């Protein structure tokens, strides 16, 4: 049955794209062109290829159903439209401009809407990117702050999911919170030197609505809707099996202040520098992609809770076997905060400038594969991703360039500057706080969270990439009782693109 479901998912993802992805003009020729960079004057073509490949030109329309799976969000159902403008083909596999539209619904209660535009030609030597996203999570993961300093009661969660015990309460809402996030951004990237060194500047406007009616973490009526009575989450605080969500406990203990608890507006300017020598963007096989940027969100820009942060990321792609056959790739990232204060609701995000938009982290498909979503949050966080990518077959089908690839990987992260978790609540809550902190061994710092895994990818025209990956946290095998199973049991993903 699982094999049948996987086959149906693959068919829904791949067949529509193969049938519809036709361009206004395509030519078959030997690819032997120069290095690719970001802006128009530098974006030409990929590294030399020895085999004949179809060069895509004109417009390529890719409507397809959004059918995917994420262990953190559940089954994804929706629709996606990609529009690629390859121009005269001289940039292939990079585009002249492209549009991305998505409306997705997840079986665990999330909705995602995305409108994105990326332009490489309108402004000479400047790339222009603009994105609007709306994410509605009626039960978003929230495990607390500072990684292993916040204890995850995996044993009770496992017991609560025991379908054979109808008297056992379901425990997962303890680690959930309602969140609405609306993000808008416009970024510019311009050439400084030789189409390899660039400046970055952008404006980002983000709105976060946390919790339910400024009263509690969750809307229990919504998450219990259509559930059998014995499967409903306890919502009455006087019930014997009721468990107050961590979010509500953090408010009681003063870890999350009443001023910040229900979210706010973040209006920020981002400024940065970028160095990019990748041969192509969607699936690079050689080059360096490094950037550093500041996020400045002062009150005078309209920000509810001011913050000043920075991000440094270094990525490198090393060809072991040429022509995209075998590539070693890695990414190092550091997300930091100036000072000792930042609103808690911005901490999960891995910040970007350019065509991508901010992603939830650390934990999940786009950050640390195999670890629970948002498991690690702190004022400063360091992370790494290492991959070995093998493209084991290439061919042409229905005038499209097709390839399949395998990869093995390891991801890791840890908090390097703690979010303040000191007790600031009323004394009647002190005992519960002390008991909670003791569960993690009264730890005062985090340790590395590491995962390993492997995946398979379907690649079409170097840009459309479908990924099947499984990640496993090594904490499952730890002998330390304060570490074992704290990052989850592993996760399987069906999604698009490479992680980086």
What role is predicted for each listed range?
Residues 29, 34-42, 131-133, 140-323:
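Transmembrane beta-strand segments of outer-membrane beta-barrel domains in Gram-negative
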Residues 47-59, 87-96, 122-128, 191-199, ...:
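Short loop/turn motifs that connect adjacent beta-strands in outer-membrane beta-barrel proteins
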Residues 59-61, 73-77, 95-97, 109-113, ...:
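Residues that define the transmembrane beta-barrel architecture of outer-membrane proteins
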Residues 60-69, 94-107, 113, 288-298, ...:
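Transmembrane beta-strand segments that form the barrel wall of outer-membrane beta-barrel proteins
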Residues 67, 79-81, 99-105, 130-138, ...:
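Transmembrane beta-barrel strands of outer-membrane/channel proteins
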Residues 90, 103-182, 333-362, 479-483:
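Outer-membrane beta-barrel translocator/channel fold
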Residues 259, 269-272, 280-398, 416-418, ...:
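C-terminal outer-membrane beta-barrel translocator/porin domains of Gram-negative envelope proteins
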Residues 458, 486-500:
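Outer-membrane beta-barrel "beta-signal"
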